[in-house]
């Protein structure tokens, strides 16, 4: 489901919605749908993995953000970038579809110096994590030649790097 959301954003769509937010019964078709973001129980509703994967985008790509160009040579790494119109905030969302960990170094070219002095929060959803904050990374790393946001991306995960508070 997160991959489809990235497909839509890549194609130029500016919004997305979830039709069935939770698993539910359709009287007219007389069947249960199980495509929701939230699992329906007798007395509890539980977020599914797809909820946390969608949260990586919905929480950190704010209304009014614009999509940025990204150059990524890794075939198993899909990355989209967004910034506020004043270029004071930036959010990158990506998916490592491969079976191996990847090294990611993000160079923010043409952004104000104030942004380059911030830190980026690193969130990840994987088999064992649910939009978990891994930590904070400097936007301007000091490890030459990796002078941007420097992150290790494990296999089969969706991640977000964001300068939002």
Show which residues each predicted segment covers.
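Short helix/loop capping segments that flank catalytic or ligand/cofactor-binding pockets
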Residues: 26-27, 102-103, 162
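Structural beta-strand/beta-sheet cores of well-ordered domains, especially the beta-sheet scaffolds
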Residues: 14, 50, 88-90, 102, ...
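Generic recognition of flexible, low-complexity loop/linker segments
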Residues: 3-6, 77-81, 93, 147-149
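Carbohydrate-binding surface patches
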Residues: 73-115, 156
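C-terminal beta-strand-rich structural cap/linker in extracellular carbohydrate-active enzymes
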Residues: 139-165
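Active-site-proximal beta-strand/loop segments in catalytic clefts of secreted hydrolases
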Residues: 18-22, 95-97, 125
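Aromatic/acidic polysaccharide-binding cleft in carbohydrate-active enzymes
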Residues: 1-59, 66-77
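Beta-strand-rich binding/interaction modules
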Residues: 101-135
